[in-house]
């Protein structure tokens, strides 16, 4: 049986890029694209709807809040419409949505539980990953391997996971620690984890987190806090 795949895109003020992201998603693979509008003040929701996405709103600001809203939407669908696999994808066009094929393949073919799209293993455009992101990824993934025994190379947001496994993780983070919480909990629960190389380019528009010193410090602190929280 062909699995149902739902894509969740948290989005805050991504009017320039959101249509491009949605248009590049392989429609033959995906049953629904859900854009979680996180209090955008621009044309993000209208552009997402015009591109064919389902748009839902989350007024509480935070990447994790938006992702949790998307999960709730997926979980509450009727049994015959409920997705088997959730793909998380950012709305800034830094990832390559067409690589969803490679991202979901280990789940479908090898019964893997969670797949992380690794920019470290893939091809990142020069300057797309800021120095603080590269450094933070290296430190965080080494700590996860040391403390939880699972080797990752990236904490990137482009990822796929079985819905039943995602619900089992009982995700709670509402801000910067979202991706690392998922990986740490998956490692702790002994989920079957793997990574696939993905491409990465400079985002459209300015980064809301890594592009500022204060954002980078807050994100780094939250990531470290989350890694140690679940020991």
Task: List each language-model region with its residue ranges.
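Acceptor/aglycone-binding surface of glycosyltransferases and processive sugar-polymer synthases
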Residues: 59-61, 65-73, 97-176, 202-214, ...
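Short beta-strand-to-loop acidic/aromatic patch adjacent to the donor-nucleotide binding site
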Residues: 80-94
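A conserved acidic beta->alpha catalytic loop
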Residues: 37-46, 93
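Short, well-formed alpha-helical segments that are part of the catalytic scaffolds
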Residues: 13-27
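Cell-envelope/extracellular polymer assembly enzymes that use nucleotide-activated donors
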Residues: 4-6, 181
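Conserved donor nucleotide-binding strand/loop of the catalytic core
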Residues: 31-34, 45-80
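Short beta-strand/loop segment that forms part of the nucleotide-sugar
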Residues: 9, 21-22, 30-40
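Acidic helix N-cap motif at the loop->helix transition within catalytic regions
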Residues: 16-20, 42-51
């Amino acid at each position: 049986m062909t699995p149902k795949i739902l894509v969740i895109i948290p989005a805050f003020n991504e009017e320039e890029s959101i249509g491009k992201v949605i248009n590049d998603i392989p429609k033959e693979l995906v049953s629904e694209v859900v854009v979680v509008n996180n209090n955008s003040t621009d044309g993000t929701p209208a552009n997402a709807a015009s591109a064919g996405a389902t748009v839902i709103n989350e007024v509480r600001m935070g990447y994790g809040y938006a992702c949790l809203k998307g999960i709730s939407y997926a979980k509450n669908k009727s049994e015959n419409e409920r997705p088997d696999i959730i793909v998380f994808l950012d709305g800034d066009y830094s990832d390559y949505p067409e690589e969803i094929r490679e991202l979901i393949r280990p789940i479908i073919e090898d019964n893997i539980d969670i797949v992380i799209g690794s920019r470290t293993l893939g091809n990142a455009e020069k300057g797309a990953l800021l120095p603080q992101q590269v450094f933070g990824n290296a430190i965080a993934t080494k700590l996860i391997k040391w403390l939880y025994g699972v080797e990752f190379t990236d904490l990137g947001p482009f990822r796929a996971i079985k819905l039943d496994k995602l619900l089992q993780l009982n995700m709670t983070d509402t801000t910067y620690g979202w991706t690392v919480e998922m990986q740490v909990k998956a490692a702790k629960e002994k989920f079957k984890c793997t990574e696939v190389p993905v491409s990465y380019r400079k985002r459209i528009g300015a980064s809301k987190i890594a592009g500022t010193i204060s954002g980078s410090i807050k994100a780094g602190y939250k990531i470290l806090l989350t890694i140690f929280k679940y020991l």
